[in-house]
């Protein structure tokens, strides 16, 4: 089954546009786990178990594991998600971007070591830095397009004078991803919820690509505006929330609180799509 098939299936089965981001910070763990990087797996597995029927995807951020030498815990978590929520796709948030030979190694890491269904990538180095991931037929790749951080304007909103129509950089990325780069229907785009007008612009340029949309929750993105701007019958959206769900409570009932926060976010997204 391809990533896009898994995504559509989980969206329908769980009636959800919500992606639960897994960005574990031991210093923010609840009492009993707080400060213990050896318990990253335990914390994340509890979140997964509490939200698996509410999510259309999970998105572990690799840096939050690697910073604590917890790659083996991430491998274990990936196995756990496969065993307990096999219908929910996993997007490895790695934002890799390097020359082809190095990209091939990163693709092995994402799809063979961790068994992810999709990965996030930086397209800054061009198509040959993306192509090795597309050799894994059925896997997905989300390209950074218009990101939610304020500094995204530094490059993404600059005009390309040498390209026909002088598009903004993020517009050019969207066109390339919808068109010549998307040879096997594996690409999607990352567009921040903090810029709903630009979500709408990206959707106009890439009408069928899945959009991974971070920034709802702690970053302040509006759920209803996000869905209205990005969702189309043939263009799915995957709306990520991480901290607002993970750290909904600092006590031993953190998993139940995470479930409550995830359900509230899912319901808000569903209300926006009607």
UniProtKB/Swiss-Prot annotation:
One of its GO terms (biological process) is 'de novo' pyrimidine nucleobase biosynthetic process. Signal peptide: none annotated. Its EC number is 4.1.1.23. PROSITE patterns: OMPDECASE (PS00156). Keywords: Decarboxylase, Lyase, Pyrimidine biosynthesis. The active site is at 95 (proton donor). InterPro entries: Aldolase_TIM (IPR013785), OMPdecase_AS (IPR018089), OMPdecase_type-2 (IPR011995), OMPdeCOase_dom (IPR001754), RibuloseP-bd_barrel (IPR011060). One of its GO terms (molecular function) is orotidine-5'-phosphate decarboxylase activity. It holds the Pfam family OMPdecase. SMART domains: OMPdecase. It catalyses: orotidine 5'-phosphate + H(+) = UMP + CO2. Pathway: Pyrimidine metabolism; UMP biosynthesis via de novo pathway; UMP from orotate: step 2/2. Belongs to the OMP decarboxylase family. Type 2 subfamily. NCBIfam families: pyrF_sub2 (TIGR02127). This is Orotidine 5'-phosphate decarboxylase.
